[in-house]
UniProtKB/Swiss-Prot annotation:
<dbReference type="InterPro" id="IPR002171">
    <property type="entry name" value="Ribosomal_uL2"/>
</dbReference>
<keyword id="KW-0687">Ribonucleoprotein</keyword>
<dbReference type="GO" id="GO:0002181">
    <property type="term" value="P:cytoplasmic translation"/>
</dbReference>
<comment type="similarity">
    <text>Belongs to the universal ribosomal protein uL2 family.</text>
</comment>
<dbReference type="InterPro" id="IPR012340">
    <property type="entry name" value="NA-bd_OB-fold"/>
</dbReference>
<dbReference type="InterPro" id="IPR022666">
    <property type="entry name" value="Ribosomal_uL2_RNA-bd_dom"/>
</dbReference>
<dbReference type="GO" id="GO:0015934">
    <property type="term" value="C:large ribosomal subunit"/>
</dbReference>
<dbReference type="InterPro" id="IPR008991">
    <property type="entry name" value="Translation_prot_SH3-like_sf"/>
</dbReference>
<keyword id="KW-0694">RNA-binding</keyword>
<dbReference type="InterPro" id="IPR014722">
    <property type="entry name" value="Rib_uL2_dom2"/>
</dbReference>
<feature type="region of interest" description="Disordered">
    <location>
        <begin position="224"/>
        <end position="275"/>
    </location>
</feature>
<dbReference type="InterPro" id="IPR022671">
    <property type="entry name" value="Ribosomal_uL2_CS"/>
</dbReference>
<dbReference type="InterPro" id="IPR022669">
    <property type="entry name" value="Ribosomal_uL2_C"/>
</dbReference>
<dbReference type="GO" id="GO:0016740">
    <property type="term" value="F:transferase activity"/>
</dbReference>
<comment type="subunit">
    <text>Part of the 50S ribosomal subunit. Forms a bridge to the 30S subunit in the 70S ribosome.</text>
</comment>
<dbReference type="GO" id="GO:0019843">
    <property type="term" value="F:rRNA binding"/>
</dbReference>
<keyword id="KW-0689">Ribosomal protein</keyword>
């Protein structure tokens, strides 16, 4: 998809870069697959901030996505490709031969009129979902389950892709874009192909307001705060952080410090993403 720049009628338009998406549906989404969602502003039930830099933004409906793809052996036709404000990837509206409709993450190359199917004996074709035990080694996949039947959890963002590099016993080995090598049960399902809208990372919002429309608030440097608010705060004029190593607002070392706590699943990581 080509990139679009704008006439520099303002600083925000001068800097903006958008991806041209002529194939996206221009009408309303399928109403039966919409759900309401309310804003939290990053606060919990006590009203305290638990997630920083969240607040405001345009109101959106949640699109109910079928991450399980458990209608086995029933072919479905792609009615259209749609924009989803809740994720970077586009979504595809499927219509099964029995009349049921659902949304899925749209793989790269999938277009209106294509046919997809899920099942153990599905052909190796973009958009089809089948267990890892039936997918040839070397195939690029996305939307992979971590536990059989739980639904897709890995590689769901725009342009995401994972390569199936090995299969031994009850586990398949995957190579993620981060460089991590990970084992997953061979009964877990995956969808063939990579996620579409792969040029999303080339977009430039152009102005701070476009970020606010998306519900993202500004990030303030710790060194610009007071000592009560951040370990880097305080000092006269432009003082440094004052620590031998930079830390988070809660004093945890940052910039490469490992914070992973789940030792139980560490055995499934064959190679760390840091190399």
């Amino acid at each position: 998809m080509p990139l679009m720049k704008f006439k520099p009628t303002s600083p925000g338009r001068r800097s903006a870069v958008r991806v041209v998406t002529p194939d996206l549906h221009k009408g309303a989404p399928h109403a039966a697959l919409l759900d309401s969602q309310s804003k939290s502003g990053g606060r919990n039930h006590h009203g305290r901030i638990t997630v920083r830099h969240v607040g405001g933004g345009h109101k959106q409906h949640y699109r109910i996505i079928d991450f399980k793809r458990n209608k086995e052996g029933i072919p479905a036709r792609v009615e259209r490709i749609e924009y989803d404000p809740n994720r970077t990837a586009h979504i595809a509206l499927l219509c099964y031969v029995d009349g049921e409709r659902c949304y899925i993450i749209a793989p790269k190359g999938l277009k209106a009129g294509d046919q997809v199917i899920a099942g153990a004996n599905a052909p190796i074709k973009t958009g089809n979902t089948l267990p890892l035990r039936n997918i040839p080694v070397g195939t690029t996949v996305h939307g992979i389950e971590l536990k059989p039947g739980k639904g897709a959890q890995i590689a769901r963002a725009a342009g995401a892709a994972v390569q199936l590099v090995a299969r031994e016993g009850i586990y398949a080995t995957l190579r993620l874009r981060s460089g991590e090598m990970r084992k997953v049960p061979v009964e877990c399902r995956a969808t063939i192909g990579e996620v579409g809208n792969d040029e999303h990372n080339l977009e430039k919002l152009g102005k701070a307001g476009a970020k606010r429309w998306r519900g993202v608030r500004p990030t303030v440097r710790g060194a610009a705060m007071n000592p009560v608010d951040h370990p880097h705060g305080g000092g006269e004029a432009k003082a440094g952080q004052g620590n031998p190593h930079p830390v988070t607002p809660w004093g945890v070392p940052t910039k490469g410090y490992k914070t992973r706590k789940n030792k139980r699943t560490q055995q499934f990581i064959v190679r760390d993403r840091r190399g």
